[in-house]
Amino acid sequence: MAVISMKQLLEAGVHFGHQTRRWNPKMDRYIFTERNGIYIIDLQKTVKKVETAYNFVRDLAADGGKILFVGTKKQAQDSVRDEAIRCGMYYINQRWLGGTLTNFETIQKRITRLKNLEKMQEDGTFDVLPKKEVILLKKEMDRLEKFLGGIKDMNGVPDALFVIDPRKERIAIAEAHKLNIPIVAIVDTNCDPDEIDYVIPGNDDAIRAVKLLTGKMADAVIEATAGESEEEVDVEEETTTA
């Protein structure tokens, strides 16, 4: 059975590209036609590309690989957070902090600070500190959580990125290239597909389109890791019976 159907893609509006005046000629191979000044994406190609990306993500996750979901534009923020959490992966949905990949040690220091602040809140340290100081510490904690909450359990650079809108996330793309981290991305008609290892041609502006495609990548992870959980249960059962 296909990973995704043409009907699902049509209903979510995945086929709507950008206005014809805002396009990247390299996307020509993924464009079906032009209608009312808007490019229509060839969904037959999208179906195949989703399948290729799905298989890559599933195989990577099955090998224990970690995927970082990235989408900071408004239309992507909720889907990126929800789907990454659903499949047990990491996400950045606010602002990409420069050096998140290329200077991960510094980012880890900020994450350690966030975890220390959370511990202080949990163990009652905040209760014995002056009110003014607590207000400042909570403000700092909230800010760190906002930008780093989705990667606070990520112990090293990820094995792949899943990106919504490579133009918007160009710093993330550049950092991934520097470290040879493969990139899966929803690529609209105004983007450069040559920058992406696994191109998913589609609308990166419609919430439903973004949710559908992001959800499929999360499904790929779940398919891989659900197998692992079953294996763990089997091993436990064997040990108990033995």
Curated annotation (Swiss-Prot):
- Cite the GO molecular-function annotations of the record: structural constituent of ribosome
Say yes or no: keyword Ribosomal protein present.
Answer: yes
Does Iron-sulfur show up as a keyword for this record? no
Q: Which InterPro entries match?
A: Ribosomal_uS2, Ribosomal_uS2_bac/mit/plastid, Ribosomal_uS2_CS, Ribosomal_uS2_flav_dom_sf
Which processes are annotated in GO (biological process)?
translation
A single Gene Ontology CC annotation of this entry is:
cytosolic small ribosomal subunit
Q: Which UniProt keywords apply?
A: Ribonucleoprotein, Ribosomal protein
Pfam name, any one = Ribosomal_S2
**Would you identify the family this protein belongs to, as annotated?**
Belongs to the universal ribosomal protein uS2 family.
- Name it: Small ribosomal subunit protein uS2
Organism from which the protein derives: Shouchella clausii (strain KSM-K16)
Q: Taxonomic classification, please?
A: Bacteria, Bacillati, Bacillota, Bacilli, Bacillales
